[in-house]
Amino acid sequence: MKTRLFSCLLTLALLLAAAPAVQAANMAYTDVPADHWAYADIANVTEAGLFQGVDATTFGVGQTMTRAQFVTALVRLFDWETVIPEMPTFSDCSDPNRWYYSAVETAYANGALPSYATSFRPLDPITREEMATMMVRALGYTSLAGRMSASQLPFNDVTTNQGYIAVAYDLGLVNGYASGQFKPDQAATREQAAAVLGRLYDKYSASSRQVSRAGYTLLTVPSPEATADTSIPTTPLEPFNDLYDALKAQRTAGTDMSQVAVVFTSGGIATTVQGSRIVSTETISQEEVEEYLDDADTHVFYSEAAQCAYLTSEGTGGRTVTVWYQNQEALEAKLLLCRLFGVNAYILQE
């Protein structure tokens, strides 16, 4: 039992961090000289297969990036399976023969586009605000953006989608200007979009690696204490929002993120409740978690907010046991967040 869960967690990093299957392309654009500020970015996204030139020899430097072009590159980056719905989602993107139709529908199906929108405006230039919003949505961080909507931004011109821009900025995907502005409504050029998506691609496709403690700045994120004033004791391992805040604090403090290792718990925290009283709270091993999971009467759940699995089990004498534990989905989500902050090292401990 222990071997099954332990092996799953140990091999996870090798599986989740694999780069999307993209085909390398030739970097032979006549409009991108080697001394161009975006040369490396354009080479990166071209070789990764995210971008194509406007023709065989021209990248299109200085041309605006359309919303359709950006969402197509985003779909390639995440390597999502193509989605073709029975009925089109957007009134202005309803022709299945359009080159961007499947990419728009695929992005929508994967949460990169808001569910309330009725039109997409595929041929409109994409703005800096829209790029940030689409990337954060694509990462599945809509709830996180909502939490960050009141964050203090270093920009004096952001009035809408503050949370999305805050997350994109915290993750190092977007920057502002020396004037203190973000210029959210400014249309992005193809090379600017290449730089932004290249940053996301590099972080998303990086590898997480399990390390020893020596030589690293260790980052631990404690679980909240169990209380009796909630429907169930809530003690998630490395709660997602707390992990985000801890990583952000390290980066803000100027820490070399490449030398940070996040410590994750491989077992779980079990809290026993009788009536409205907490009887006990203890850390348990992977083997003990597996024993609960093998019990047919155990109920299994997953908290999207905390990015942590939990189970409930009825004990003797009217007692209920709640266990928050590390599973593959939880560790995958947290390792990705770490990589987005530039942290690739982690420690998995009992």
Stretches with model-predicted labels:
Residues T46, Y108-A109, Y169, R251, ...:
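Alpha-helix C-terminal capping/helix-coil junction sites
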Residues S223-T227, Q326-R339:
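Short, acidic/polar
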Residues K334-E350:
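Acidic/aromatic/glycine-rich contiguous surface patches that form carbohydrate-binding/processing clefts
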Residues L5-T11, L15-Y39, E47, Q52-Y101, ...:
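Feature responds to low-complexity, polar/acidic, surface-exposed segments characteristic
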Residues A214-Y292:
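Substrate-binding surface in catalytic domains of secreted glycosidases
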Residues M1-K2:
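N-terminal secretory signal peptides that target proteins for export/translocation
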Residues S258-Q259, V263-K334:
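Glycan-binding loop/region signatures in secreted carbohydrate-active enzymes
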